[in-house]
Amino acid sequence: MSLLLQQHLSQPWRFLDHTSFGPTFQALQSFAYDDTLCTSIGKSQSPPTLRAWVHHNTVVLGIQDSRLPQIKAGIEALKGFQHDVIVRNSGGLAVVLDSGILNLSLVLKEEKGFSIDDGYELMYELICSMFQDHREQIEAREIVGSYCPGSYDLSIDGKKFAGISQRRIRGGVAVQIYLCVSGSGAERAKMIRTFYDKAVAGQPTKFVYPRIKPETMASLSELLGQPHNVSDVLLKALMTLQQHGASLLTESLSADEWLLYEQHFARISERNEKLLAE
């Protein structure tokens, strides 16, 4: 049993299930939710929270992506794939969200000594514990050729199925992961490759954008050779929390948190419009 998980999970955890809100649930709302949770948990007004979320056919761009020379052509290409496009309020590059991708946010208070690496390791250990039978196969290292590459890409046999990011604001930490549960990892990667082809168009860029190789990405269903869906992977997450001492609470947001959420959502939406209009 992971000591890191035991240390952070053996306490009451609130669980928010945002996996079945449907196509009208916007990805911008998720970033507003996590900023809200960071704020209230950072002030010790709410317990640590696991939030599970699913969005339909959306590509989330990083701020650097939004400054590519032919960004409007890139966005039009994504719309041609029937995907909405937003720019997120934190670092990283383009990622795909759809009904076969489960996102998990572990939101907790930023305690002294809880480093950036500790945040990444906490999520990595959670995923390894969820898929205990495959623990030895799951690696955390950058997968060159994947979209949104990073040192905590999770892969099996060199094929990436998940990426971890982290946001720290107002005394709270949100460690977020997207898990490609079902569908084709390569097809998602081909769409992002098309985006970069159109948005870069052979012109100089201010950052090194990823050269996408679709064969470097796959879903858990493809990698494990058996069908998985969002619901059964979420159940694994909840069971793993309980196995490490968490008592799960199913309270919704408090009245104060709803007010905060509305403020965060308005701010994030306005910022997103500005970034897409530049």
UniProtKB/Swiss-Prot annotation:
The keyword Acyltransferase applies. It holds the Pfam family LplA-B_cat. CDD domains: LplA. GO terms for biological process: lipoate biosynthetic process; protein modification process. GO terms for molecular function: lipoyl(octanoyl) transferase activity. Its EC number is 2.3.1.204. Pathway: Protein modification; protein lipoylation via endogenous pathway; protein N(6)-(lipoyl)lysine from octanoyl-[acyl-carrier-protein]. Keywords: Acyltransferase, Transferase. The keyword Transferase applies. Belongs to the octanoyltransferase LipL family. This is Octanoyl-[GcvH]:protein N-octanoyltransferase.
